[in-house]
Amino acid sequence: VRPLLQEIYQDDPWKMLVCCILLNLTKRQQVDGIRHELFYKYPTEYEMIEADEDELSEILKPLGLYRKRAKTLIKFSWMWVNGFSDVMELYGIGQYARDSWEIFQMNNMDVKPTDKVLLAYLDIVN
C-alpha cells in the first residue's frame, strides 16, 4: 500500500496542502504524474508566489481546470507566507484539506472526515 501524499509531505505542511488542493476533483494518479515537476520548479511557497501563471498552468494542464488551479496555488501560497490563524482562512482550502491538516499536522486523530481514504487511514492508525 502506497503512503498518502499527506504522509509523504507531512514534514512540509505547505506541500501537503498544495497536494490536498490538487487532489480536489482529481485522482491521486494524476497528481502523482505532475507533483515532482511542480515541486522541482516551485520547491517552496516563495517560488510559487513568483510563479508565471502560464508556466504553472502548463505543469497543471494534465489535471484539468489548470488556469483556476494555478491562480489558486499562487493565492494560497501568498496567504500562507503572510500568516493565518486557522487553515480554513487560506484560499483554496476545503474540508478535505482541513481534515488532512488536523490529522497530519495537528496529530488530531479524533477528526471525523467524510473522505473515504482519510477514514480508512484513521481506521488503520487508531
Give, region by region, the residue ranges found by the protein language model.
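Catalytic cores of DNA base-excision repair glycosylases
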Residues: 3-126
